[in-house]
């Protein structure tokens, strides 16, 4: 931390069925600064991006995330793609992207600069190689075990 200035890190995601990959991601993101704010994807955004509604509504996903020690605050995103206005309001120093998020770091950084924000955009590595750390794989295993 430079002087008394706190470094604010922002991440975003669905976080529908929380798993160990999410925890590793949040821990790594928190290590990039002093304060971690999570933007939880709006239910409509999940439906549009994943082709299915979320298992858990955004309010529940946010509540679960608030209980994680690495997370300082949680906000629910707006419907649609990344809201530059929301990011501007949150005033991050760093935006950490997950390894499976399909955003280009450079493009996002340029969009942020176009609205007057100088934000470092970092892609975090995928540390957990098992299928247990993918929500889609967890859903598949649940249906195989309980629906066959």
Swiss-Prot record:
InterPro entries to which the protein is assigned, alphabetical: Archaeal_FAD_synthase, Cyt_trans-like, FAD_synth_RibL, Rossmann-like_a/b/a_fold
Keyword Metal-binding in record: no
Enzymatic reactions: FMN + ATP + H(+) = FAD + diphosphate
Nucleotide-binding is among the record's keywords: yes
GO BP terms in the entry: FAD biosynthetic process; FMN metabolic process
Annotated transmembrane regions: none
Swiss-Prot/TrEMBL cofactor(s): a divalent metal cation
Key words of the record: ATP-binding, FAD, Flavoprotein, FMN, Nucleotide-binding, Nucleotidyltransferase, Transferase
Top EC category: transferase
EC code(s) of this entry: 2.7.7.2
Family note: Belongs to the archaeal FAD synthase family.
Function: Catalyzes the transfer of the AMP portion of ATP to flavin mononucleotide (FMN) to produce flavin adenine dinucleotide (FAD) coenzyme.
Protein name listed in UniProt: FAD synthase
Organism for this UniProt entry: Pyrococcus abyssi (strain GE5 / Orsay)
Gene: ribL
